[in-house]
């Protein structure tokens, strides 16, 4: 019996070393049941190695990891996890229905149960008209969608998706987003490893930023994207001491002629900044606030050197 009160994913100082290279260093993470969790980092940051350790495809050098409150080696736990890898090679001589039926057999599903589930999933990923085609005839996007159907075949409690929108057109990406939202509504936990930050921004509840194999920040997505504001001010009579005084609201203030760029913690600071400038005799012509995108936050948190 899998305990339902335990986190969907829990790691403690999980570490993987290949020779003299630390791929993942002291990964400590907790993903709650029913949330969509984004795992973000540049190439080479250790994301895929972390996923492989969670799936017991790569053994950790040290540390602990649990899925759904149980051991990674527990067959019952493994049977409640669905996985879509970034790079896959499916049996391309099989038809779409045959491919899913093969995996249904591996899950020991009854014939009637398998047929019903396969029909539902083909409809979910919009592949019903192509169910009789061999996988070698599928486009990259169609293969991605049949892979997603395979990951959901066992109605898992935890779904791990590694770059699920890779190779998809805008319609396909929207379909994947809709599937993820439906999984959330059903209480399924989704662990999303993606470099498409715009997709993460739309779908995730919380995100973790990983760099050099270590988690450097975990935060609710809403507090990230609704928090800081990037503000551009166009004004005259800007004396150096006045510009310096803006540091009480912003840790980053840049002056370029009649333009000031600063970062505020929230909208509540806007009237105070405007009032301060006017009281200092500054002629304010424009004050333009703009939400910082997840991409900009990613660069701020992870840096421009990426995972190298």
For the regions a language model picked out, list residue spans one by one.
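An acidic, carboxylate-rich microenvironment
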Residues: 62, 76, 98, 113, ...
